[in-house]
A protein has these predicted regions:
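Short, flexible helical or helix-coil boundary motifs
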Residues: 36-39, 61, 78-81
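Long amphipathic alpha-helical coiled-coil segments
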Residues: 65-83
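Short amphipathic alpha-helical coiled-coil/interface segments
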Residues: 53, 57-60, 64
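Short E/K-rich amphipathic alpha-helical oligomerization segments
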Residues: 19-55
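Non-transmembrane coiled-coil alpha-helices
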Residues: 14, 25-28, 60, 67
């Protein structure tokens, strides 16, 4: 029973972190989209900011994938403990 509680807490923590990452990615995407539109229409845009946002967005994508994999592993372990 103790292991189930530990896994539940870990799953909840990872899920909250995943939601934070999704929120950050959403904010970044909006900013990237605005800069991308300026770039595509030939208007002046902050190239350094754009590249920085793209890099950070890719890092968040990798972190998001890792968290999803971790949550899936925890869920699998959780159900194995239940059985």
């Amino acid at each position: 029973m103790r292991r189930i509680d530990e896994l539940t807490a870990e799953i909840n923590e990872a899920t909250l972190e995943l939601q934070k990452i999704k929120d950050q990615m959403s904010k970044q995407f909006k900013e990237i989209w605005k800069l991308q539109c300026k770039k595509d229409t030939g208007k002046e845009y902050d190239k350094e900011r754009y590249e920085s946002l793209m890099y950070n967005h890719k890092l968040l994508q990798m972190k998001r994938r890792q968290l999803i994999t971790h949550i899936n592993y925890l869920n699998k372990e959780f159900f194995e403990v239940l059985i």
